Amino acid sequence: NARRKQSGTLIFWFKEWLDLTDNHDNAQLLMHTDPKDPHGQDLHKIINTLRLDTNRQVLLSTTKITPQHLAAMYGMVDCTINISDAEGFGLATLESLSCGTPIIVNMTGGLQEQITDGLDWFGIPLYPSSKAIIGSQDVPYIYEDRLDKKQFFSAMDKMMALGKEGRKEMGLKGRDHVMKNYNFTNFNAVWIENLLNLHEKGGSWDTRNYNQGIRFKEVA
């Protein structure tokens, strides 16, 4: 429920999509998060304000659960959504694909690598409509990839139009993608290979050469 996760935005947009498609009795948004996260929004307040608690249109999962129960949760939903405006990788969507459940994601960060292998798609992509540059004293600048809600509505419609079998086929392709490209055998091999290459090219601490070309000047 951090600000960049856009949890409040997702709830507002989900409510609008329910209104547009008359699906208040047929669709449910399940969020596994902390609704009182000090770095996020008060999700209880948003849900109550939008009256999304009347038919339990939005459910919150707030306690830690076992991997088996988490896998069951992914298995019982139609898709997993991530509309974060910045995402390093996105563990939840990787978990979703590994359980055979397709995803709807913002095309930012590592999410771009998860949703497609360059040939097949394992969900519905959302392309940023604008980019903002934000920052702080510690982080001078970072990009925010912002979405248009109409594109979100369209993605939801497309996902539902696939039907149960279409979503299953897409999700199983995504699972194959995860098993092939994110397994621990490959991870261990690539990790060791990268460290050896770094040592070979950059040297050890006493013989390091990555700072060549950098000039240090005294500032009065």
Q: Which residues make up each language-model segment?
A:
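A conserved mid-protein helix/loop that constitutes part of the nucleotide-sugar donor-binding site
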Residues: 2-18
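Nucleotide-activated donor-binding/catalytic signature segment of Leloir-type glycosyltransferases, i.e.
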Residues: 40-68, 72
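Aromatic "clamp/platform" in nucleotide-sugar-dependent glycosyltransferases that forms part
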Residues: 85
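Conserved donor-binding/catalytic loop of nucleotide-activated donor transferases
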Residues: 75-77, 95-107, 117-119
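Short glycine/serine-rich donor-binding loops of glycosyltransferases
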Residues: 90-93, 111
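C-terminal amphipathic helix plus adjacent low-complexity
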Residues: 139-145, 149-220
